[in-house]
Amino acid sequence: MKRRDFLKGLLTAAALAPVSKLAAAAVQTPASAGKVSRRKYRSTDLTLPMLGFGMMRLPRKKNSPEIDYEKTAAMFDRAMKAGVNYFDTAYFYLGGRSENCAGDLLSKYPRDSYFLASKMPVGRVKTAADLERIFNEQLTKCKTTYFDFYMLHALNASGWAKSKRLGVYEFLMKKKAEGKIRKLGFSFHDTPEVLEEIASAHPWDFAQIQVNYLDWTLYRSREQYEILTRKNIPVIVMEPLRGGILAKLNPAATQILSNAAPGKSNASWAFRYVGSLPNVLITLSGMTCMEHLDDNIKTFSNFTVLSPAERKTLDAALTAYRKGLAVPCTDCRYCLPCPVGVEIPRIFAMYNQMKLTGNRGAFTRSYGALDEDAQGSACVACGKCVKACPQKINIPEQLKRIDMDFKRMKRSKKAFNAAIPDEELYS
């Protein structure tokens, strides 16, 4: 996506306009003391927590890709006590470690006390035989005999065509008939036109899409949400903070929100925006520390939808924020590994932070600390990352621009005169 088109999307005045009620709203049930609010699944007695625990960004051990089990276990305990008993993992998450973690840490709880969601990695499937092998592997890793919610993972036009060719839906429906899947849906990264085709193809139990107040028009999330709502398909939301971006707004936007609600986090505004949509069943959050979890529990306990005045406040904050954002990366890391080792999401995070804070010194120091093979200049424009990017970012073009900016800043002595707070340095 070109930056011009990106900013044009942000400028759309309807970005925060309330969506029409195209179908019956999910019924919210009163929260018990210390627990998050819940919503009913369609017209059944099944209730699910409005907050779901995403397992793509679990805490890691220092200087290691390994999951910090001690910290994660403590967070799971806290979540379960607060009624946050929906856990979302996937075959690829955290280098394949996420499903193992789910099995290792959740198996101590009674199986009927929590909901477990995982996904068939359509991109990894080559033949129909792979379906059985991968599904059984997932059950083993998660130490379970069934998944409460299961998805075709990250569908787009090509993934959907492949799924039809290999009979993925039919295979998973057999697993559902065997009791190994309770609810079958899909997660999605493409245009509303493709979503219309997929949503119309089968009687899906739910769908997982990217929704947040930044992408409501930018990523055409509103159109996607309305398609699913018209078809009475409950929505599970991913990327409500857009990869953490909406939790770290620039000072101007943050000030607007804090003036309106002192003591409330930027993240709480983003979660309330998503939770205010009537057909949203669960909002996922990839929490990496106890502070994130505690703040989210506070937001979703006795949940209240945004008022018209609060929507106007959020609109004003978005207007202030849009001036500083450079690259619409959510840090999903689907672009990795880069064949030549470029640290794509890390570079984008550095650059966006610099644009938001104006601290060129922090950017040049952190970018310059990367190995040369990890910098944008090492990109060979093979295009592998572009095909994998759910945001459709022209990654080679952005890397080239960022590397040019870095070299230009490095030549300027002013870049090194800025104060560099420790928290803005990237390790």
PLM regions with names:
Residues 41, 53, 87, 102, ...:
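Conserved, mostly hydrophobic/aromatic
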